[in-house]
């Protein structure tokens, strides 16, 4: 799909159908099903859960071939919206697993209950959690939480794995496929609004 074809679809397509048929279905041209199985096996081993208790979807530019939104880099520069996927681009994975979600949620709940104040200030972690999404970059930074730390250890190791191309791999954890689907639809609606402003 060319960038012009993608923009045309985002302007006119039924976005729920687009999410179901394009984003949540089919393979990524940049991350193979064998590589996905390797990630699944690694997570299952680390967290002592069954592989079939999770699903993994490639999302973002590694699925569509283009990054839909402007992105700020660590240096403060901005990468343009609809930039093509490049060999050095991150691989974004959505991990869908009620079991794994509850394992990490339970650890966060114990941490919150051990805090001296209530409600515990979850920061932006809670803002995303209400959408059924645990964002690892918002895990508590000043607490040693084993299951949360395990997440970073797993994805750090995966990012340096030659079988996965030694490129940055990021994982976001969703409670269900419906939670991921709703988030993707919301993002595409925002993308459509941005495109309409440009026309």
Q: Which positions does each model-derived feature cover?
A:
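Catalytic core of pol beta-like nucleotidyltransferases
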Residues: 1-89, 96-199
């Amino acid at each position: 799909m060319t960038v012009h074809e993608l923009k045309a679809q985002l302007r006119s397509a039924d976005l729920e159908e687009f999410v179901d048929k394009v984003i949540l279905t089919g393979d990524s041209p940049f991350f193979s099903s064998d590589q996905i199985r390797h990630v699944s096996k690694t997570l299952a081993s680390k967290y002592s859960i069954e592989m079939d208790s999770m699903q993994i979807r490639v999302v973002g530019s590694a699925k569509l071939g283009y990054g839909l939104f402007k992105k700020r880099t660590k240096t403060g520069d901005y990468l343009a919206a609809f930039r093509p996927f490049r060999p050095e681009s991150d691989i974004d994975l959505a991990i869908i697993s009620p079991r794994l979600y509850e394992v990490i949620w339970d650890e966060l709940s114990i941490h919150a209950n051990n805090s001296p104040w209530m409600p515990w200030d979850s920061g932006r972690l809670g803002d995303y959690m209400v959408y059924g999404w645990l964002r690892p970059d918002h895990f508590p930074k000043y607490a040693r939480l084993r299951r949360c730390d395990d997440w970073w250890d797993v994805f750090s190791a995966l990012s340096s794995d030659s079988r996965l191309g030694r490129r940055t791999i990021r994982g976001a954890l969703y409670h269900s496929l419906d939670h991921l689907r709703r988030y993707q639809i919301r993002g595409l609606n925002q993308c459509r609004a941005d495109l309409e402003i440009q026309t």
